[in-house]
């Protein structure tokens, strides 16, 4: 199996981060609809479960990495009363433009801001945030370990990193059902609805290539987190990871 850094959306010589930026700029207008469709609406439930895991920490400032169209940032402001400010960073301007529209419609523009930044080189001082989150974005990092190191760096002592990611089921029969769905349904429907043949072939490939469960928890520990654990959701097709600095 190829390393996640080798799995890219397009067959070009461009670095992965540039390809990911181009892909999300291209599919931005379809992203939310397809995200809800392919997860059967469960992506909303997964976000809410993930948010509940950081709520006890009562963060005031949150960094949402790979914020996309801002769904997680908005849900954080809705459901965690202690949060004063969420900073969303992403490579894709088109995704964040949609996010800005959603934030304005929710009257949250005084609590959520967006910045186009690479998660591997965050423009923040050490110990800047009470929590860091990333939903459905870790597998797109050009270097997952470096991304974890950067998120660790900007966290305050004792603060949580929460990662929500898609995952490969390992139990019968969910594994077999997922493999068919990921290999045959997602690429065909995604190609038809998004007009991007590569983007929704890349999706299951990137999920398959990234470290998962114990492997990712161990990687989190290796970059400095004093505690790392995970919780499987919805027949193992999604996983929430928590790391404590």
From Swiss-Prot:
Catalytic reactions on record: a 2-demethylmenaquinol + S-adenosyl-L-methionine = a menaquinol + S-adenosyl-L-homocysteine + H(+)
Any single GO BP term: menaquinone biosynthetic process
InterPro entries, per database record: SAM-dependent_MTases_sf (IPR029063), UbiE/COQ5_MeTrFase (IPR004033)
EC number: 2.1.1.163
Positions with a binding annotation for S-adenosyl-L-methionine: 69, 90, 118-119
Entry-linked SUPFAM superfamilies: S-adenosyl-L-methionine-dependent methyltransferases (SSF53335)
Keyword Metal-binding listed: no
Gene Ontology molecular functions: demethylmenaquinone methyltransferase activity
Annotated keywords: Menaquinone biosynthesis, Methyltransferase, S-adenosyl-L-methionine, Transferase
Pathway, per record: Quinol/quinone metabolism; menaquinone biosynthesis; menaquinol from 1,4-dihydroxy-2-naphthoate: step 2/2
HAMAP family linked: MenG_UbiE_methyltr
Functional summary from the UniProt entry: Methyltransferase required for the conversion of demethylmenaquinol (DMKH2) to menaquinol (MKH2).
Family assignment from sequence similarity: Belongs to the class I-like SAM-binding methyltransferase superfamily. MenG/UbiE family.
PANTHER family from the UniProt entry: 2-METHOXY-6-POLYPRENYL-1,4-BENZOQUINOL METHYLASE, MITOCHONDRIAL, METHYLTRANSFERASE
Name recorded for this polypeptide: Demethylmenaquinone methyltransferase
Species of the source: Porphyromonas gingivalis (strain ATCC 33277 / DSM 20709 / CIP 103683 / JCM 12257 / NCTC 11834 / 2561)
């Amino acid at each position: 199996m190829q390393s996640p850094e080798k799995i890219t959306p397009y067959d070009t010589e461009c670095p992965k981060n540039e390809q990911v930026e181009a892909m999300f700029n291209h599919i931005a207008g379809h992203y939310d609809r397809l995200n809800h469709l392919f997860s059967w609406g469960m992506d909303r439930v997964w976000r809410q479960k993930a948010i509940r895991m950081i709520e006890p920490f009562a963060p005031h400032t949150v960094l949402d990495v790979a914020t996309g169209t801002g769904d997680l940032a908005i849900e954080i402001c809705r459901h965690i009363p202690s949060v004063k400010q969420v900073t969303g960073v992403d490579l894709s301007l088109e995704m964040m433009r949609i996010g800005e529209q959603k934030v304005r419609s929710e009257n949250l523009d005084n609590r959520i801001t967006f910045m186009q930044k690479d998660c591997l080189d965050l423009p923040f001082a050490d110990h800047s945030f009470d929590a860091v989150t990333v939903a459905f974005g870790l597998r797109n990092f050009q270097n997952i370990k470096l991304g974890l190191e950067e998120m660790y760096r900007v966290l305050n002592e004792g603060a949580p990193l929460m990662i929500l990611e898609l995952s490969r089921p390992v139990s019968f029969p969910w594994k077999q059902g997922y493999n068919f769905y990921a290999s045959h349904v997602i690429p065909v429907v995604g190609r038809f609805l998004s007009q991007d043949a590569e983007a929704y072939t890349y999706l299951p490939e990137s999920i398959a290539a990234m470290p998962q469960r114990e492997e990712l928890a161990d990687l989190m520990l290796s970059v400095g987190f004093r505690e790392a654990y995970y919780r499987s959701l919805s027949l193992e097709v999604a996983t929430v990871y928590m790391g404590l600095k």
